[in-house]
């Protein structure tokens, strides 16, 4: 996390940025709860007890998070090291995995469904946000590393089989994988790409405008989205290539080693299922009583 780009700037001006904000109020279909949270997250602590107004305030929660941590760190980091090495991770990522072994290190976790060519652009934004926040916390004295959770266990193939890109004519173009590549009941991360992926990659570059970056980008995409590779590995490999310099740790929850580490959590959740369901129902009633919509 020593890269200057991981530093925590106090203001956009200090970062050399000129911002022209687009308020979410101007974007259709936003929920009232979301907009109220953006305006004043602290006012919603009834529903979000750990809400903060400024990101640097999160450091105060580190002792609580560390005290609640139960996973065996060495086993966790061994699994993460093996996964990220397979995906082509750089020294920065492997160094961060070693940092995570320390009992005083916290993880800043973001995540998103895996998708064709990484999916929507905000997937990359989410990943870089974790990098920036981990850098901010580390700079202020809380050891932190960025982690990105690849949501490989999702079963909704229709949501992740298509990528939308801006074509040469300035319009949106859809690039899709075949529907029959996925079998009902199979996590999308376990879908295995076949030879047709080469045609899909070619269609992408047929519609994209050419630039000085085309050859390099084509090499990255063809290396990641290759026949016989799982959808999880393809997405992970491309994301790794794109953000390799920033130390981002990728996590695939389908990995058997990680599932074994999570077994006690699943056992506890199953044991307390009635209690959890009752708590969710009670919170939904509270939200609706405050003129918000139920979240689940």
Residues covered by each model-derived region:
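N-terminal targeting/trafficking signals and adjacent low-complexity tails
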Residues: 1-296
